[in-house]
A protein has these predicted regions:
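Conserved, well-folded catalytic cores of nucleic-acid-processing
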Residues: 10-17, 36-40, 58-65, 80, ...
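P-loop NTPase nucleotide-binding module
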Residues: 127, 136, 156-158, 163-228, ...
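Switch/coupling sub-region of P-loop NTPases
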Residues: 188-191, 207-330, 336-338
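Conserved small/polar residues in nucleotide/adenosyl-binding loops
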Residues: 399-406
Length: 407
């Protein structure tokens, strides 16, 4: 038996699991058993320190994942069965040399994560979204859905407040773009953020949300809470609830948006629109809640419009032209994110919705990528009414003239 497993077994034999066990007590028992084992097996000081940490993590934390969770350079952790762990650093994927001791240990960690988020995961409910205490987002898939063993994906979020300046430092966009985004938020433009999986939609949503004036009443709606708004006292956070084992007590995004509208919000922020709740979000934007923000999966600003149209049709039989009219009056600006060739997350496109043209939603490009892969200003905002109404017009005039279009 490996020393780690031997130590773990002896520690567990010493503990009384019928009583609450503090971290301090557990660490004391581990240290005591390490001293005993070192009398049987010669151990270096470095071995004792390593065993102490590994056994504590195995019994109280998330085992081999704990070091990765505490490593700020790791942004994503992917577990494909107990033997295969991959991590993302600076947009690049790497295979992690460590792995779980066996399938049983992986399942223990999965159940620990799920129960900590009040989620149930089993064969009857094999796909679960959850979050860790630090806000990291977790997706779990169990066999037989996951053919080669249980999988768990953990998307971490920065511990420091995510601001537009923070994103500038990581070269997601320039300071000029950051100033423009702040103006859009301050002037209460309704904004949709689009992008693929892992493109940074939630991170940008966090950064933009932290530009909201501190005296407003904000309601956030998410499937798994991960937004971190700082300095807003009048903040209400709502989270979707999955159905229980009997298929009851579900509270979906559509219901949460309906509840939010009755709670006198200044703005509503929806973490991600995925289905028929898209119509509820459009209604919220159309009924006096200017400055609302949401995100969705799409490949471009134009594709985001098609996606919203499809999502609305998932819940209601409504003429397509009527849906497009709702979008044209509800959404002011769409911001698209993507990944560049080196894997880094970038802001790729900003477009303004200017109304309807020939039964289509009219998109007016404000910023686009040029031939040098740089985000370049193409045009000023057409609708500047909100800029003037909310005192942001002068700030917007500080920008230089738009660049001529590439030929």
């Amino acid at each position: 038996m490996a020393l780690k497993e031997l130590l773990k077994q002896r520690v567990m034999e010493k503990l009384n699991f019928s009583q609450e066990i503090s971290d301090e007590h557990l660490k004391g028992v581990i240290q005591e058993e390490i001293m005993k084992i070192s009398e049987e097996y010669p151990l270096l000081l470095s071995d004792k320190i390593r065993l102490n940490q590994e056994v504590f993590y195995a019994l109280r934390r998330l085992d081999i994942l704990q070091d990765l969770l505490e490593d700020d350079s790791v942004t994503e952790i992917m577990i494909n069965g107990y033997k295969n762990i991959f991590i993302e650093r600076q947009g690049k994927l790497h295979r992690y040399p460590g792995h779980f001791s066996d399938n049983e240990k992986l399942y223990q960690v999965i159940q620990q994560v799920a129960s900590g988020a009040n989620r149930m995961v089993n064969e009857r409910n094999p796909i679960v979204d959850a979050r860790l205490n630090d806000g990291s987002r977790v997706n779990i898939i169990l066999p037989p859905i996951s053919i080669d063993g249980a999988t768990m994906t953990i998307r971490k979020f920065a511990k420091e407040p995510m601001t537009l300046a923070w994103l500038c430092e990581r070269e997601a966009f320039s300071e000029e773009i950051a100033k423009f985004l702040k103006i859009l938020v301050r002037a209460r433009y309704n904004i949709f953020i689009s992008g693929g999986t892992g493109s940074g939609k939630t991170t940008l949503l966090n950064g933009m949300s932290n530009c909201i004036p501190k005296d407003e009443r904000i309601i956030t709606i998410e499937d798994s809470a991960e937004l971190k708004l700082n300095g807003i006292d009048n903040l209400v956070r709502l989270e979707m609830r999955n159905a229980n084992a009997a298929g009851e007590n579900q509270v979906d995004m559509k219901e949460l948006i309906k509840a939010a509208l009755r709670s006198r919000p200044d703005r509503i922020i929806v973490g991600e629109v995925r289905g028929e709740e898209a119509l509820s979000m459009l209604n919220a934007m159309n009924t006096g809640h200017d400055g609302s923000i949401s995100t969705g999966h799409a490949n471009s600003c134009k594709d985001m419009l098609k996606r919203i149209e499809t999502m609305v049709l998932m819940g209601v039989d409504m003429p397509v032209e009527a849906i497009r009219g709702q979008m044209a009056s509800a959404i002011d600006v769409i911001i698209h994110l993507g990944r560049s060739f080196d894997g880094s997350r970038k802001l790729m496109e900003i477009s303004e919705i200017t109304g309807m043209a020939a039964s289509q939603v009219a998109l007016h490009p404000l910023f686009e990528m040029n031939e040098d892969d740089e985000l370049t200003m193409r045009s000023e905002l057409c609708d500047q009414k909100k800029l003037k109404e909310y005192g942001q017009y002068e700030a917007c005039l500080l920008y230089t003239s738009p660049s001529p279009r590439d030929s």
